[in-house]
UniProtKB/Swiss-Prot annotation:
Lineage: Eukaryota, Fungi, Dikarya, Ascomycota, Saccharomycotina
Protein name, per record: ADP-ribose 1''-phosphate phosphatase
CDD domains for this protein: Macro_Poa1p-like
One GO process term, biological-process aspect: peptidyl-glutamate ADP-deribosylation
Role: Highly specific phosphatase involved in the metabolism of ADP-ribose 1''-phosphate (Appr1p) which is produced as a consequence of tRNA splicing.
Amino acid sequence: MSNIHYIKGNILKGRTYKRIIIHSCNANGAWGGGIAYQLAVKHPKAEEVYVDLCERFGQKLLGKCVVIPSYSDDDVLIGCLFTSIFGGASHGSGTSIVDYTDKALSHFDELLAKEQSKSDNANLDKEIEKLLKLKSGVLKDYKLEMPKINSGIFGVPWPETEEVLKKYDRSMNFTVYEL
């Protein structure tokens, strides 16, 4: 049985359950396009937190997952998979984005299991853990939802990212929204 379930619909539409909206993003502090832009419009305080993290930690965020409260809906967290240094036309190669997606999902898997971060940067770990304390409930109680990450602005063919998601079939189940 697959750990990926596809549905058609708008990922940003309100739901009656706890969920983490996962997206891939750059470490340059720009939620300027795609789902990231839509998240910024809907959850501006979350974007402020993201920008602050990027300004303070930059490329040290690559391959990490940071879970940010939406600040506008207690049932929504935003899972940022840092897969590229820059966004837009300056993003990394498809291979590096897929590799960083795998690393970020591995980091996310650790967060789900322990609700704490372990990396080579103690200050970044403290920030990640501080943000985790702002949520209500346990991370494992949240459904994991995403668009077809990496396939928009980053230009990675969806099957490449899909293969990475399948690697986490023992610990994570994803609902992927298609338009």
